[in-house]
């Protein structure tokens, strides 16, 4: 056809020399096309009807209870309530035998195939009761497994990928700590640099552009660092911070690691609240998910110290889940009417919770042992407005800050409650003593902050007015009431930051950017009082040797950066960084040495001083030598550049003389120069005198 049109056109206009014959697109005789229909029309063929059409939205539920006809309706209501959470159910069939008794399985048809797939994903292996655990499958899966080929084909061997050593950061012979610095380079693009805090200057390990969209977070033992992205989050680790695992959860805003780094919890928003997913870190598998309402307090998960349990607070109850199955402990929640808050012990499987006052029944703080659910201590409290639970890091003590009132005022409908005559109690539970005795400390002033010494038996309190507060230090000992050991008066601090190793504390005012470093073993002397204007964060390194204060661009846009101090408050580094976001020290895993071995090392520490000091001197000498060599190299480079320019200037002398009227201006004396002063009017002012 194309050839015929070409001949007609040629006859009509034979004189048109620009016209060229159209190419012939006809296939030659015997041509065989090697492109399959799937490659050419894959998108259209995917829509053709298949034999499975009509049953892909059907699920088969096995291991349901076998009941008589009189109990069938109740069974249907229970099962339909579960399965209707994942879509509209069109049809349900419960096969029965001759006596009308169910056979232990059922068929359910959803409106859409995607709903059936979601039901299978969520309800497979769901435990209905102690004797029945669902086995839920798609109806099409039966056909798929029936068509398994009889001849077995061995799977293809995949090459083993050697994973980077995740704990190489603790193998440094000098035990230098690492930290990361994040700075926003563009909207939703954050650059993260990883550094090692070596002497005399930190060493840059790695810098990643566009590493995260918002911020980063270290895992509790420092093994992983997590980054946030639109599709979800990812964890990185190893010597070069390779991607270890990714967790698809769009819009994730916050994550939590379990204390032993076995699980990760992601929190992401939904139209009705937020979705919470618990992941297995090693496999990347989703262990369980929850959809919570908008109340963040009720949706926060708290882990036991050994990762064996995770708990959340519900309405008048605590839900405790066992790992790795994530079923409720004993398949039921713990009913606690009026519960307002709870917290795990950091070293034992003990939960502390408090219950509000109800109908003339006093408020109560309870310690419960898990998994026995045995109450090991109760403490009744009267006239309670609120409570806060503060565990000491070693688990030796629990402090309950009790906000108490002298008078309660309610409106007619009891909708608005006002507490008058507020005062505060600190109930100290001695967890390691017999029958867990409780001591009380009362303070009649406003409480601004409370902090335990992580390793030790002291706690500190900021109380009084905001601009002129007092800082009190108490010491807790066995068999006696907590004693006030020091009070620092007229301080303007708002936060307290103890060193991870105890003894030293930073009293910070994060509104004004002022800091005071205090040594609690030397009569609480203030060793230094530096300022860092607009500083909004304070970070101790894991060893308690360094402190960093930072000004984040999340708070201000000018003069962002961080300062590094020694534990005594001496400034050692100032860094101004545009759009600085956050500074985080890399955590360390707990030591493998026993307490006896640690005490022995501390006792004989003087033996190591000479070796340490010699090593420090060599390091500083090496650093000084490197600095001198660097300066010498820079000087040589400059002199080489200078000599080249002088030689070039000398070569151009004849041309300069020619351009300047055959006058050698290079050797002119200053006496031969005429100086002429030119004056001109710049401004004129008129002043009237009386």
UniProtKB/Swiss-Prot annotation:
WD repeats lie at residues 207-246, 293-331, 334-369, 442-484, 530-575. Transmembrane segments: none annotated. Residues 57-141 form the RRM domain. It comes from the Eukaryota. It holds the Pfam family eIF2A. InterPro entries: EIF3B, eIF3B_RRM, Nucleotide-bd_a/b_plait_sf, RBD_domain_sf, RRM_dom, TIF_beta_prop-like, WD40/YVTN_repeat-like_dom_sf. Residues 1-36 are annotated as: Disordered. Residues 15-25 have a biased composition (Acidic residues). PROSITE patterns: RRM. Keywords: Coiled coil, Cytoplasm, Initiation factor, Protein biosynthesis, Repeat, RNA-binding, WD repeat. SMART domains: RRM (SM00360). One of its GO terms (cellular component) is eukaryotic 48S preinitiation complex. It is found in: Cytoplasm. Residues 1-11 have a biased composition (Basic and acidic residues). SUPFAM superfamilies: DPP6 N-terminal domain-like, RNA-binding domain, RBD. One of its GO terms (biological process) is formation of cytoplasmic translation initiation complex. Residues 595-645 form a coiled coil. One of its GO terms (molecular function) is translation initiation factor binding. PANTHER family: EUKARYOTIC TRANSLATION INITIATION FACTOR 3 EIF3 -RELATED (PTHR14068), EUKARYOTIC TRANSLATION INITIATION FACTOR 3 SUBUNIT B (PTHR14068:SF0). Belongs to the eIF-3 subunit B family. RNA-binding component of the eukaryotic translation initiation factor 3 (eIF-3) complex, which is involved in protein synthesis of a specialized repertoire of mRNAs and, together with other initiation factors, stimulates binding of mRNA and methionyl-tRNAi to the 40S ribosome. The eIF-3 complex specifically targets and initiates translation of a subset of mRNAs involved in cell proliferation. Component of the eukaryotic translation initiation factor 3 (eIF-3) complex. The eIF-3 complex interacts with pix. Interacts with mxt. This is Eukaryotic translation initiation factor 3 subunit B. It comes from Drosophila simulans. The gene is eIF3b.
């Amino acid at each position: 056809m194309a050839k015929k049109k070409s001949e007609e056109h040629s006859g009509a206009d034979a004189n048109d020399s620009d016209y060229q014959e159209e190419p012939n697109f006809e296939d030659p005789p015997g041509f065989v096309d090697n492109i399959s229909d799937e490659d050419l029309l894959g998108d259209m063929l995917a829509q053709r009807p298949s034999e499975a059409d009509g049953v892909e939205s059907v699920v088969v539920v096995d291991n349901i209870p076998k009941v008589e006809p009189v109990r069938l309706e109740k069974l249907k209501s229970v099962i339909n309530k579960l399965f209707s959470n994942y879509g509209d159910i069109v049809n349900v069939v419960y096969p029965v035998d001759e006596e009308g008794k169910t056979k232990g399985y059922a068929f359910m048809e959803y409106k859409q195939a995607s709903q059936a797939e979601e039901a299978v994903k969520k309800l497979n292996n769901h435990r209905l009761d102690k004797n029945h655990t669902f086995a839920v499958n798609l109806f099409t899966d039966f056909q798929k497994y029936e068509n398994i080929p009889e001849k077995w084909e061995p799977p293809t061997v995949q090459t083993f990928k050697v994973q980077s050593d995740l704990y190489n950061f603790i193998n440094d012979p000098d035990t230098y700590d690492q930290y990361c610095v994040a700075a926003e380079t563009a909207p939703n693009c954050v650059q993260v640099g990883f550094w090692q805090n070596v002497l005399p200057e930190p060493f840059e390990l790695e810098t990643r552009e566009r590493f995260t969209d918002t911020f980063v977070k270290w895992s509790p033992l420092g093994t992983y660092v997590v980054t946030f992205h639109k599709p979800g989050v990812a964890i990185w680790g190893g010597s070069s911070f390779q991607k270890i695992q990714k967790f698809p959860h769009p819009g994730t805003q916050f994550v939590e690691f379990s204390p032993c780094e076995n699980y990760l919890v992601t929190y992401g928003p939904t139209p009705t609240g937020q979705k919470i997913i618990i992941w297995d870190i090693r496999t990347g598998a989703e262990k369980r998910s929850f959809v919570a309402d908008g109340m963040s307090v009720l949706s926060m998960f708290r882990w036991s110290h050994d990762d064996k349990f995770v708990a959340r607070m519900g309405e008048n109850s605590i839900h405790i889940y066992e790992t790795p199955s994530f079923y409720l402990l004993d398949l039921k929640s713990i009913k606690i009417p009026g519960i307002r808050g709870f917290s795990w012990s950091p070293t034992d499987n003990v939960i502390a919770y408090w219950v509000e006052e109800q109908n003339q029944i006093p408020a109560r703080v309870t310690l419960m042992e898990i998994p026995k659910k045995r109450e090991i201590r109760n403490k009744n409290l009267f006239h309670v407005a609120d409570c806060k639970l503060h565990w000491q890091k070693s688990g030796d003590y629990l402090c309950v800050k009790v906000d108490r009132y002298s008078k309660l005022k309610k409106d007619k409908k009891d909708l608005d409650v006002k507490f008058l005559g507020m005062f505060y109690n600190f109930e100290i539970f001695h967890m390691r003593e017999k029958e867990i005795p409780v001591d009380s400390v009362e303070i009649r002033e406003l409480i601004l902050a409370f902090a335990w010494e992580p390793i030790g038996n002291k706690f500190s309190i900021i109380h009084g007015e905001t601009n002129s507060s007092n800082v009190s230090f108490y010491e807790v000992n066995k068999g006696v009431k907590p004693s006030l050991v020091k009070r620092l008066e007229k301080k303007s601090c708002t936060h307290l930051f103890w060193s991870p190793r105890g003894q030293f504390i930073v009293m910070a005012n994060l509104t004004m950017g002022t800091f005071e470093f205090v040594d609690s073993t030397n009569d609480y002397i203030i060793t230094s009082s530096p300022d860092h204007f607009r500083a909004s964060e304070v970070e101790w390194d894991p060893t308690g040797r360094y402190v960093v204060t930072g000004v984040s661009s999340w708070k201000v846009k000018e003069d962002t950066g961080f300062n590094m101090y020694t534990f005594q408050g001496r400034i050692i580094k100032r860094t101004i960084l545009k759009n600085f976001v956050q500074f985080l020290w890399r955590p360390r895993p707990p030591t493998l040495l026993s307490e006896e071995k640690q005490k022995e090392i501390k006792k004989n520490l003087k033996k190591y001083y000479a070796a340490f000091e010699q090593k420090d001197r060599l390091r500083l000498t090496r650093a000084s030598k490197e600095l001198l060599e660097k300066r010498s190299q820079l000087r040589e480079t400059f002199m080489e550049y200078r000599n080249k320019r002088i030689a070039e200037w000398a070569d151009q002398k004849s041309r300069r003389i020619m351009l300047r009227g055959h006058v050698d201006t290079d050797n002119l004396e200053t006496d031969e120069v005429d100086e002429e002063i030119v004056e001109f009017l710049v401004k004129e002012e008129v002043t009237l005198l009386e």
